[in-house]
């Protein structure tokens, strides 16, 4: 019954991805092997879980930016169901707990442009086979191609020169992360006027791409402190974006409109 209803968790794979990102060694063999033997590939994948974050010390071993690079790798792939662990609000490699309190929102890292772009890429690539290569035979970067339709490039170290081979169909592509950097594919070669920056994600596809309106965002300023001592007061700066109708309410009182 469990095998029919549940999914295997690829914990070892997550460990391999963490090591690959932090050591800048995204070899094809490391990235491609799920370490599950003959188990069905309907597993859950992650870069880190809450246990990895706290008990394994990944909170100080891996920055949020590195977690996002790992997320791009596992989410661009054909198989698995990726699970994103959102770290505590205002946490860092110096402070694992951040402003962690019951009811407090987590970190905004899941809203990062790279996360958003690769999530939409995954949906657009359903049904496409995958091909994993190291561009220019450079194992500090990896390219995950999905048929001839799209590709995600994750670069962990120095700026990466283009001009490498690809299965992408000929045409012009825009990096869906920054929305502006153009890449050209002609006769099996991918080129751009710009190098691929270190510690970055490039998401390339045209077929299946959809333009969405920016979602409304509300929150508090990044330096907001929540662990206020009893009897003390604090100033809280509310933030909002992509909306003209943000509101807050205190203790059941009437809602009050505010601007960013």
Feature map (PLM): residue ranges:
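Low-complexity, disordered linker/stalk regions enriched in Pro/Thr/Ser/Gly
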Residues: 211-260
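Active-site-proximal helices and loops of the catalytic beta/alpha 8
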Residues: 3-213
């Amino acid at each position: 019954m469990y095998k029919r209803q549940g999914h295997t968790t690829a914990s070892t794979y997550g460990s391999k991805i963490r090591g690959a990102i932090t050591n800048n060694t995204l070899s094809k063999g490391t990235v491609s092997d799920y370490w599950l033997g003959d188990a069905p590939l309907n597993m859950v994948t992650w870069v880190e879980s809450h246990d990895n974050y706290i008990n394994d010390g990944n909170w100080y071993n891996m920055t949020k930016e590195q977690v996002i690079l790992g997320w791009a790798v596992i989410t661009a792939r054909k198989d698995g169901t990726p699970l994103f662990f959102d770290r505590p609000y205002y946490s860092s490699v110096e402070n694992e707990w951040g402003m962690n309190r019951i009811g407090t929102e987590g970190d905004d890292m899941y809203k990062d442009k790279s996360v958003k772009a690769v999530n939409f890429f995954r949906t657009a690539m359903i049904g496409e086979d995958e091909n994993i290569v190291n561009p220019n035979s450079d194992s500090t970067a990896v390219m995950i191609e999905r048929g001839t339709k799209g590709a995600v490039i994750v670069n962990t170290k120095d700026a990466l020169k283009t001009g490498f081979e690809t299965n992408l169909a000929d045409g012009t592509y825009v990096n869906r992360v920054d929305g502006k950097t153009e890449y050209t594919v002609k006769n099996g070669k991918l080129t751009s006027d710009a190098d691929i920056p270190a510690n970055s994600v490039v998401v390339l596809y045209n077929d299946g791409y959809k333009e969405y309106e920016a979602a409304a965002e509300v929150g508090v300023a990044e330096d907001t402190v929540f662990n206020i001592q009893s009897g003390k007061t604090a100033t809280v700066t509310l933030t909002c974006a992509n909306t003209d109708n943000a509101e807050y309410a205190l203790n059941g009182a009437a809602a009050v409109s505010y601007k960013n």
